[in-house]
Design a protein with these regions (language model features):
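Short, amphipathic alpha-helical interaction segments embedded in low-complexity terminal/linker regions
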Residues: 1-223, 251, 345-349
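Acidic, serine/proline-rich low-complexity intrinsically disordered regions
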Residues: 140-349
Length: 349
């Protein structure tokens, strides 16, 4: 690509930025706390795709971008790159989550029961006010509500396929992975992937460009405690409590190399409450790592190369929007090549 330096437009760019800030003055009147509490799913989406858990910063980013969630995630990701790293926390076990909502479409009767929690899945999608005024729920203390996955009984019976763990956990925030892509890198990429992109890829596998029709073995939203080894005392301390979503999808039974038949599963996890993203991630996990659903490059979602390079919203938006920047030299060279080719063709005649 060719670029050309622009000097004369510096003042125009400055004025454009000032005008943009002027048009967003009404956004500044909105309190950050109101965004956090009133637009919680938007905040969760930005934290997940921005790869930084901070409701306050995500809310500020939403205000700064006037509700453009892709742009807000960009702000948050950029801020993340400037944060100092002090260490690595202990791995979160989703079986130890304090559950606010947890259901299974694979099993009717499960340990702890079906906990519907707060959801509008069962609501008619009409824009009406005050249609659910009566409060008929029972209060429960989520601090004591710790239940293992509904698929755990099958796992204890050794009926579920286990994938081999990576010898070394990748960190895509430090080094972008290269082929062959470790599963830890793929899962990290999906964890901070753009929800719409992941839904689109997952849907291709369901609708006809693949062969996935999963059953939700266990999907849960709630809080997880983050623990960290103190650098001085060397004791394990609690450093944060995160809202998270985790999903285990059950695929189908698959014959293993040792001849045993086991159930394939996919796993999805993300910051905040975003069940659609977690389900999509679990479906993509199935398509990428289960031979039953993977048929080479015939299906979009079965191609790790396709997936890992096309689901990041910040990357996709950044590169797409860069086409608005000056490409004068590039286009002029195209015109020159066309002109020369036309002249050459005329001379040959």
């Amino acid at each position: 690509m060719g670029y050309v330096a622009i000097k004369g437009g510096e003042e125009a760019i400055e004025n454009s930025l000032n005008l943009y800030e002027e048009t967003l003055q009404s956004s500044n009147k909105i309190k950050t706390e109101d965004v956090t509490t009133g637009l919680r799913f938007a905040v969760d989406k930005v934290m997940s795709e921005g790869s930084l858990y901070s409701k306050k910063l995500a809310s500020i980013a939403i205000k700064k971008s006037a509700g453009d969630l892709l742009n807000a995630a960009f702000f948050l990701r950029a801020h993340r790159s400037s944060c100092q790293r002090i260490g690595i926390a202990k791995t979160i076990d989703t079986n130890e989550m304090h559950i606010q909502r947890r259901i299974s479409s694979a099993f009717k009767d499960i340990q702890g029961g079906q906990i519907l929690g707060a959801s509008n899945d069962y609501e008619v999608k009409l824009i009406l006010n005050n249609i659910h005024q009566s409060k008929k729920w029972e209060y429960f203390n989520e601090e004591d509500n710790i239940i293992k996955s509904a698929l755990e009984p099958l796992r204890k019976k050794n009926l579920i396929k286990n994938l081999k763990a990576d010898n070394e956990i990748s960190d895509i925030t430090r080094v972008f992975p290269e082929p062959p892509y470790p599963r830890s890198a793929v899962m990290q990429t999906m964890c901070r992937g753009e929800a719409g992109s992941m839904l689109g890829f997952a849907y291709t596998s369901i609708r006809g460009y693949g062969d996935v029709h999963p059953t939700i073995g266990d999907i849960r939203t709630g809080t997880s405690i983050v623990k960290f080894t103190h650098p001085f005392t060397k004791k394990e301390v609690k450093v944060a409590t995160l809202d998270v979503t985790a999903c285990e999808s059950a695929g189908t039974f698959e014959k293993q190399e040792n001849g045993k038949v086991k159930l394939t599963t996919g796993f999805g996890f993300c910051f905040g409450f975003n069940e659609t993203k977690a389900i999509s991630m679990s479906i993509l996990d199935l398509t990428l790592y289960s031979a039953k659903f993977s048929v080479g490059e015939k299906e979009f979602a079965s191609d790790i190369e396709m997936m890992i390079h096309h689901i990041d919203g910040v990357d996709s938006m950044g590169f797409t929007n860069h086409f608005k920047l000056p490409h004068y030299v590039t286009f002029q060279s195209d015109l020159q090549v066309f002109s020369n080719a036309s002249d050459f063709a005329k001379d040959k005649k």
